[in-house]
Amino acid sequence: MSLIKQHDALLLDLDGTVWEGGRAIDGAVDFINSCALPSIYVTNNASRAPEIVAEKLSAIALKATADDVLTSAQAAVTLAGEHVSPGAKILVIGADSFRDLVRDGGYTVVSSADDQPAAVVQGFDPSVGWEQLTEGALAIRQGAVYIASNLDTSLPTERGLAVGNGSLVAAVQTATEVAPVSAGKPEPAMFVQAAHRLGSTKPLVVGDRLDTDIAGGNAAAMTTFHVLTGVSHEIALLEADVEHRPNFIGESLADMARNANELRPGPQGGFTARVDGLDLLIDNGDADATSIQALRTALEVAWSMPKPPRYIQPVSDKAKEVIQGWR
């Protein structure tokens, strides 16, 4: 049975999974439109309102409304309610749409530490600079609760990995020596909220980043599917901590149409893997075997080792051929 038929909903990451910047990832749109499963796009990118994200999805031919989108900014507003009183002053570091969400949550939005905010919430926005970060830091030093929408250190774009919200949060954390509570992935709350919105009992979490998408799905006790179209690639998978390991691995979203057993870590494509001291050796391989088949073969053995392999050593010519592009 295909992986997709074993589940009743998709909880999809966006950046690096469905698109990069403004460009749809090859095959993603066709697969999502053809799979016939209800989906929610669960994104750590707090720079756009759900309505804007839905418009962007529609622009690449994916049918979506604001109800099909759950952002870390929305999750941050929900989290704020656990820390401050209704109507409290909140200093927002981030996009205008984030400020609107905070206002819609019943809070008073301020922009200066002099306003004595009860909380500082920080989300990604390309325009964030020294002034906003400093006002946030001053407020936190005065006792404001510090909430981050997400802690992704980088953001996939068409030109490569850009600075993410987590890197900007790190500047404030360094200045204040206060670590924020985080609302977004890898915390499980977003996935639980998304599944509840769809009435799903067997959701599949799909993403490209091990430390957010996969870790969050695992924390929510959901099945996870990792794609190689974004941030975390082969070496990251081989070195992944237990809580960051996906149940299934594919090259892209389209692989969800494959038999689930093909997507699990384990021997395939005629490859074999074995431990040699601190190293992992990959051998054999059928003539038409692929890189991802070698990866799944290697993962089963690598994940059984007490520590990540020191070196990945290809033995056969086929193994050398297919793993030369691993990164």
Describe each PLM feature range.
Residues S72-Q74:
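Polytopic endomembrane small-metabolite transporters, centered on the Drug/Metabolite Transporter
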Residues S2-L12, E20-G22, D26, S34, ...:
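Asp-based, Mg2+/Mn2+-dependent phosphohydrolase catalytic module
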Residues V42:
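Glycine-rich loop-to-alpha-helix module at the N-terminal edge of alpha/beta enzyme cores
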Residues G16:
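Receiver (REC) domain active-site loop signature in two-component systems and cognate sites
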Residues P50-E51:
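Switch/connector loops and helix/strand junctions flanking conserved nucleotide-binding motifs
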Residues L37:
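Conserved phosphoryl-transfer catalytic core
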Residues N45:
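Conserved phosphate/oxyanion-binding catalytic-loop motifs
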